[in-house]
From Swiss-Prot:
Residues 1-19 are cytoplasmic. It comes from the Bacteria. The chain crosses the membrane at residues 20-42. One of its GO terms (biological process) is respiratory chain complex IV assembly. The keyword Cell membrane applies. GO terms for molecular function: copper ion binding. Residues 43-203 are periplasmic. PANTHER family: CYTOCHROME C OXIDASE ASSEMBLY PROTEIN COX11, MITOCHONDRIAL-RELATED, CYTOCHROME C OXIDASE ASSEMBLY PROTEIN COX11-RELATED. This is Cytochrome c oxidase assembly protein CtaG. GO terms for cellular component: plasma membrane. Exerts its effect at some terminal stage of cytochrome c oxidase synthesis, probably by being involved in the insertion of the copper B into subunit I.
Length: 203
């Protein structure tokens, strides 16, 4: 009888430990999901998240290249997206360009406000494949600042960039021939004073 009771107690203990582990795992998963959700809800936090983790192929912001271009060429493809709630048309002028690695290059996007109101937006960005983000360096980009378009205004926005020659030393990217640079514009919060002026209630 004593042996049977001991076995039952041991079995109950194992079940309790198993439930405890499941609860801890579920709590961790919920915390991670909540953090990712909060991050995506805020464009500035999203950019910080990408910069810290490399998630989605976050690119580098840097100075002009210090070494000469190399002979290797890579085709850069451009992608454009607009989040729901932003009445903009947004597209790349050039669908793709082939550049020498290490050479400073220029591309353009256009954005048009299709509404009758002034609108403000911020752009997030990423590179595919994600590993290439560490070597894609932007010198000038509309994504660095909030963009404002007047009613029905259309704007051409440049991107100045280069691919760091150090990519040639990365064994995982030695056969890479294409990189996709993707942007998504999200609505930005209008400052209170600007909103008040637009509604006619401001001083």
């Amino acid at each position: 009888m004593d042996a049977g009771k001991a076995e039952r107690r041991a079995g109950n203990g194992r079940r309790t430990d198993g439930r405890r582990h499941l609860v801890v795992a579920a709590a961790c998963a919920a915390f991670i999901a909540a953090m990712v959700g909060v991050t995506y809800a805020s464009v500035p936090l999203y950019a910080m998240f990408c910069a810290l983790t490399g998630f989605g192929g976050a690119t580098r912001v840097g100075a002009a290249p210090t070494s000469a271009p190399i002979e290797r060429e890579i085709t850069i493809r451009f992608d454009a997206n607009v989040a729901p709630g932003l009445p903009w048309a947004f597209a790349p002028v050039e669908r793709d360009v082939t550049v020498k690695v290490g050479a400073t290059s220029l591309a353009h996007y256009t954005a048009a406000n299709r509404s009758s109101m002034e609108t403000h937006a911020n752009a997030t960005y990423n590179v595919s494949p994600p590993q290439a983000g560490a070597y894609f360096v932007k010198l000038q980009c509309f994504c660095f600042d909030e963009q404002t378009l007047a009613p029905n205004e259309k704007l051409e926005m440049p991107v100045v960039f280069y691919v760091d020659p150090a990519i040639a030393q990365d064994p995982d990217l030695k056969t890479l021939t294409d990189i996709t640079l993707s942007y998504t514009f999200f609505p930005a919060k209008t400052p209170d004073k600007a909103a008040a002026r637009a509604s006619g209630t401001g001083g």
